[in-house]
Structure formats: structure tokens, C-alpha cells
Swiss-Prot record:
Protein name: Diaminopimelate epimerase
Underlying gene: dapF
Subunit structure: Homodimer.
Organism annotation: Bradyrhizobium sp. (strain BTAi1 / ATCC BAA-1182)
Disulfide bond sites: none
Positions of the catalytic residues: 76, 225
Entry's Gene Ontology cellular component terms: cytosol
Length: 289
């Protein structure tokens, strides 16, 4: 029987990003891809955030992040805010450090009671760090397009690694006017991205405001992607088209992103909403090896 049988979970969302938080700090078990997919079939989610016992002194937990296709991700900003809210409400803490595959994340209570800030770390721009399948000296724009050569629908994205690979396509109009559900999977799995990529359409309203929409690697079309918001804000600032503190409008809500000048860390601030608490039925994992 799966170690997840009869285990409790919490369903939350980070501005529309559907999140399941599973605290396994008292259980020595690593969730398998089959188990992650079984959970998604019963409790639909974009990301499954699994708290495991801390591996490093001074950290609250080691966080494994699963997409709904069973693959693992290095970062999920919206999911981290949900984890932070759960931990803070249980312990009364106002700050904590978590370890993820992408590194250490410092988190704290935001400027209002319903806001939480996650330090998403330092963005990476080198073509091998993103990674890309071929060399590009300047990743502010790379050669990639969808549509006819002489009239591409989308072209020349900026690429950033924000704990996972991101490609940001800049558009002049409404981000909802593009068929991201059609283009997203093609671009996510393009050969230029050996580890696949998150695909974002972004419109710069002004230097303090960007609207965006994301096809999330391993999860599909989503109402929100925190790491994509960070990547988009950083990419816009690299192009000198936006300030280092910017308001991001996503289909699910608003995030404030700051690319801190003194150390290049990216800070993401937003809400985390509780939906319900439940317990996994044993039969959910009956077909899981």
C-alpha cells in the first residue's frame, strides 16, 4: 500500500495556480511519478508541494515539487507561498528558509497579513545554464519563432533560468488574443530546450506594469506561474523596458516582483489562499506500483 494512503493534504491556490500541499516530514517516503499522477487525477493541481524532513541545518523542510504529469520541477513561486502560509499559521513564525532542488529559498511575512514574500534567488542567463541546445551569446533575445518566416506570430523570446527554464515572448497587444493552448506545447517541447521550458506571452504596459500568460512546463495552461512572473520581470528589466520593481498581472491575480539591485535576488510577493483540507483514500493508489 502507498505511504500516502489515508494521509492528509491541503488544497490551496496562489493567485489561481492550483496547489496541493503534502507534509511528509513525519514519513520517510519519496513520492513517485505514478503517485503524483494519481493525486492529480483525484485532486486536480498544477503543482504538488511535498514537505520532506530538512536535510540542512537551519531549514524548515526540503521541498519536492511535482507537476501534474508526474515530472519534478526545481521551482514554483506560487506553491512556495502556499507552503509558507501553512507553516507560518501552524508555527507562528514570520520567516523561514526552505531547501528545494533549485537551492535555498528565504521566505517571510509580506507587508500585509495576507501577503507572503519568497526570495526566489538569482536568475541565470548563460545559454548552458538555462539550458539551451545551442550557443547564444546574448540570451536577451534568441532566434525562435512560430509562424511564417516573413510574418511570424511569435518570435525572438528572452530566456531566463529562474530555478527552471523560461522563454518570454513579447507581444504588443492583449496576451489573451494569442492561441497559447496551441502554441504552448509546441514551444515547451522545442528541440532548443533540452529540459523543456515554460512559455510566457508578456505585454509591457509601462515601466511599472506587465501583463502575462503562461503555458507551464509539465502542467499546461495555468492562471498563474510565480517563477514565470519573476523571469518575465527580470527579462524586461534586462532589456531596460521595465523598472526593477514591477506589478505583474496574471489571469489569476497580481504579483509584485522586485529584482533587488544590491544582490540581484528576485523577490516575489503575493497571496496564498486556503481552499480545503482532505485525506487520500487508499483505493486512489490501488493501481500504483
Amino acid at each position: 500500500m502507498s505511504a500516502l494512503a489515508n494521509h492528509s493534504f491541503v488544497k490551496m491556490n496562489g493567485i489561481g495556480n492550483e496547489i496541493v500541499v503534502l507534509d511528509l516530514r513525519d514519513v520517510k517516503h519519496v513520492v513517485t511519478p505514478d503517485e503524483a499522477r494519481a493525486v492529480a487525477a483525484r485532486v486536480p493541481y498544477d503543482q504538488l508541494m511535498v514537505l520532506q524532513p530538512p536535510r540542512l541545518d537551519g531549514t524548515e523542510a526540503f521541498i519536492r515539487i511535482y507537476n501534474n504529469d508526474g515530472s519534478e520541477s526545481g521551482a514554483c513561486g506560487n506553491g512556495m507561498r502556499c507552503v509558507v502560509r501553512q507553516v507560518f499559521e501552524k508555527t507562528g513564525q514570520a520567516s523561514a528558509t526552505f531547501e528545494t532542488r533549485a537551492g535555498l529559498l528565504n521566505c517571510w511575512q509580506g507587508p500585509a497579513p495576507d501577503l507572503y514574500t519568497v526570495d526566489m534567488g538569482v536568475p541565470k542567463f548563460g545559454w548552458q545554464e538555462i539550458p539551451l541546445a545551442e550557443e547564444f551569446r546574448d540570451t536577451r533575445y534568441i532566434e525562435l519563432q512560430i509562424g511564417p518566416i516573413d510574418a511570424p506570430i511569435l518570435h525572438s523570446p528572452s530566456v531566463v533560468n529562474m530555478g527552471n527554464p523560461h522563454a518570454v515572448f513579447w507581444v504588443d497587444g492583449d496576451v489573451n488574443s494569442y492561441d497559447l493552448e496551441r502554441f504552448g506545447p509546441l514551444l515547451e517541447n522545442h528541440p532548443i530546450f533540452p529540459e523543456r521550458a515554460n512559455i510566457t506571452l508578456a505585454h509591457i504596459v509601462d515601466r511599472d506594469h506587465i501583463t502575462m500568460r503562461t503555458w507551464e512546463r509539465g502542467a499546461g495552461l495555468t492562471k498563474a506561474c510565480g517563477s514565470a512572473a519573476c523571469a518575465t520581470a527580470v527579462a524586461a528589466a534586462r532589456l531596460k523596458r521595465a523598472n526593477r520593481i514591477v506589478q505583474m498581472t496574471l489571469p489569476g491575480g497580481e504579483l509584485t516582483i522586485e529584482w533587488r539591485e544590491r544582490d540581484d535576488h528576485v523577490l516575489m510577493t503575493g497571496t496564498a489562499t486556503f481552499e480545503f483540507e482532505g485525506r487520500f483514500e487508499p483505493q486512489l493508489f490501488a493501481s500504483v506500483a
